[in-house]
Amino acid sequence: MPGKTLYDKIWDAHVVAEQDGEAILYIDLHLIHEVTTPQAFAGLRVAGRPVRRPDRTLAVADHNVPTEGQGLGIDAVADEEARLQLQTLAKNVAEHGIEFFSMGDVRNGIVHVVGPEQGRTQPGMTIVCGDSHTSTHGAFGALAHGIGTSEVEHVLATQTLRQKKAKNMRVRIEGEPAPGVGAKDFALAVIGEIGTAGGTGYVIEYAGSAVRALSMEGRMTLCNLTIEGGAKAGLIAPDEMTYAYLQGRPAAPKGGAWEMALDYWKGFHSDEDAVFDREIVLDAAKIAPTVTWGTSPEDVVAVTGLVPSPDSFGTPDKRASAARALEYMGLTAGQPITEAKVDVVFIGSCTNSRIEDLRAAAAIVAKALEGGRKVAPGVRAMVVPGSGLVREQAEAEGLDEVFKAAGFDWREPGCSMCLGMNPDRLAPGERCASTSNRNFEGRQGRGGRTHLMSPAMAAAAAIAGHIADVREFL
């Protein structure tokens, strides 16, 4: 009998019952926010049900919070719908005794930054949230994925979830990347390789020497974008780097419980003889700094490359999609992607708003300042830390002063311009170099044009005024 994959082991450890090819899984951690919970709590109220495990639930305010003036509190939020959602969340969590990091609390921030930062995310766990990028937590060897509002209600009521088991895929990234290439480039390269539907029906385990060399924050970036490849979740087996990241965090085990946890966590890895349903291998040395050119995360090109022609695609549907994307993005087939001028630069989101992301961007900006360069004229650039604690750390290191000296806006934490649900939005026709995870039509604002890239690449674009090769700034 073949060995088990990491996914198999986590699944088996959480099955409560099985029937007709489906299972009831126990959920270790439920993360909630203001957008996907109002109806779920209303359903509990109608049914007269309590929250089953408030202690395994954590709430934050992130999606539609403004990134300025948070100290004024929820009641001062200008947008009526956003204010109501935030007020409703505060009322619901107070009623059910759920820990809540609200606006103005230094611990608050984007849910997928806060969970790991607090040590709530741990190896071997099952983690769900009403947000598709819950896959971020897979960087710790946790089975983590998004759920819908009706499932949010079910987990609140029962601490379980009905699931059908996915297939196993392994993506190995081997070798040493070139300078200027990192986790975001890996993620975009994987999506470019398999497409946005390539992972459908799978849970992806990332492995290989280049993945092992990533920091925990880099691993979170890689797992975050798994959903853009169509997969249910992304996983990376825990190792010494994982344990070092977790040790001493507020919710991490302490004392003797830490040693017991380590013994347990070390069992969560794929066996050597485990069989994967699909396996893909990428050479890190062949991955260049990467950006998107179109309106799907699979529309990727090396920064040194050209915008593709619709005629280069193999099917009529793909050709039509590419033609539409070029029209929407205001690009011409065959033009160098570096000719695309940018109006806005956004450094933030659950993909790239952690301290290492800000350090990488600030390093590019600092070098530009040494040469007398700042944010290019006509470019609006903003940096939005992923949490209040990230913001504090960045300010302690002086990163905020670097950004502000170059002309960047330094904001308060939140999802911000990742999605058009708060005041940070693109105007129609504006082009944005963004460190977020989705470049769909209108994602950052109606008519906005989004190019996904790494924090360092986004910083380079802000200085150059157009998409630029970060290696020219190193």
Swiss-Prot record:
One of its GO terms (biological process) is L-leucine biosynthetic process. Keywords: 4Fe-4S, Amino-acid biosynthesis, Branched-chain amino acid biosynthesis, Iron, Iron-sulfur, Leucine biosynthesis, Lyase, Metal-binding. Binds 1 [4Fe-4S] cluster per subunit. One of its GO terms (molecular function) is metal ion binding. [4Fe-4S] cluster binds at C350, C415, C418. It is an enzyme of class 4 (lyase). Pfam families: Aconitase (PF00330). The keyword Lipid metabolism does not apply. Signal peptide: none annotated. CDD domains: IPMI. Pathway: Amino-acid biosynthesis; L-leucine biosynthesis; L-leucine from 3-methyl-2-oxobutanoate: step 2/4. It catalyses: (2R,3S)-3-isopropylmalate = (2S)-2-isopropylmalate. Its EC number is 4.2.1.33. Its cofactor is [4Fe-4S] cluster. Heterodimer of LeuC and LeuD. HAMAP family: LeuC_type1. Belongs to the aconitase/IPM isomerase family. LeuC type 1 subfamily. Catalyzes the isomerization between 2-isopropylmalate and 3-isopropylmalate, via the formation of 2-isopropylmaleate. PANTHER family: 3-ISOPROPYLMALATE DEHYDRATASE, HOMOACONITASE, MITOCHONDRIAL-RELATED. This is 3-isopropylmalate dehydratase large subunit. It comes from Phenylobacterium zucineum (strain HLK1). The lineage of its organism: Bacteria, Pseudomonadati, Pseudomonadota, Alphaproteobacteria, Caulobacterales.
